[in-house]
Amino acid sequence: MRAVPWKPVALITTTISILLLLLLLPACCCLRKGMPALKLPEPPPSRIPEIGASDIPTPTEAQAHAPTEAMMRNVDFHIDATTVLHIHSLRGQFVAKQPGAPVNFDNKTQFVVKIDRAKIGMDSAGLDQLMNRYVFGYPGAPLRDLHVVPEGKQIVQSGIMHKGVDIPFTMYGDVSATKDGRIRIHPTKLQICSINGLGLLKALGLSMEKMLDLSKAKGVVAEQNDLLLEPTKILPPPQIDAHLVEVHVEGGELMQVFDAGMHLPELTLPYPNEKNVMYYRHGTLRMGKLLMVDADMEVTDTDPRDPFDFFIDRYNDQLAAGWEHNTPVYGLMVFMRDYQDLGLPAQPGERLRP
């Protein structure tokens, strides 16, 4: 009896299977060239005010001799006009990049936020804009029109994968923190129309790592089928220095827990009953023409019913719309209007200028 040439037969069978799979994909109308891109509202360009860009000498007596200690609670911190980090709690330090320089609120490119510990969430809208504007916001990106929804214990991400042609996809993924402080998104299900995308990739001997060219992406790499994101590198200025220890879905947000192990002591607020607050202590702060030496400034919003909506690019507008007073120990208590309330009539229950 003549031996059957199994290896050639297996090779031919595999090749035919791959060709059939490639033919089936267009048949399900999932591969279409030239699909229109999802139009997200563009934020106004981030600007550094003239006073922040100009060279204003710092008097010797105002040079910073220590970092500015910081804490935040219930703050919606804008990284642009519409993308928000929900800071539930934060303890850290603001440090100027130039030794001895003050922390300049008018130039967020010139200081670093060193987070000791924090709990920070992002909702679906924020995740959409973060991924589309900052991670994959460049021409020819392999992923676009991304929509991310925290659901149950997973995130559901849909969008367009471009590999020669546009491939609409929906991916269900588990989230976890790696030992080196990155967010791991591990797909448990990948849908391309009615086709099992993970099974398809396996049949073709492919993976997300092989499919996606992420060389130009910001703060993300692929490892097999997992995506690894560096939370401190995917954000625009100010620069963040932090270590992620946990990530999970909570209350409709992708919740990130940071702990750098600095064990900074708790700060004592001058007015501890404020629900939504930022507090800055020690070091030197610059805000426009004002230099605050050995800073002691508590900042809250005029409307305490919801989180403090703060945008550092527009801090002076928020300050001008609010009010402040000195404390008995020469500190400042500042009441700012929420960024989203600028230009609107006073809200019911809002604390107005005395």
Task: List where the protein language model places each region.
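Short hydrophobic alpha-helical membrane-anchoring segments
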Residues: 20-30
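Extracellular/lumenal and peripheral-membrane lipid-interaction modules
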Residues: 29-354
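N-terminal Sec-pathway targeting helices
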Residues: 2-20
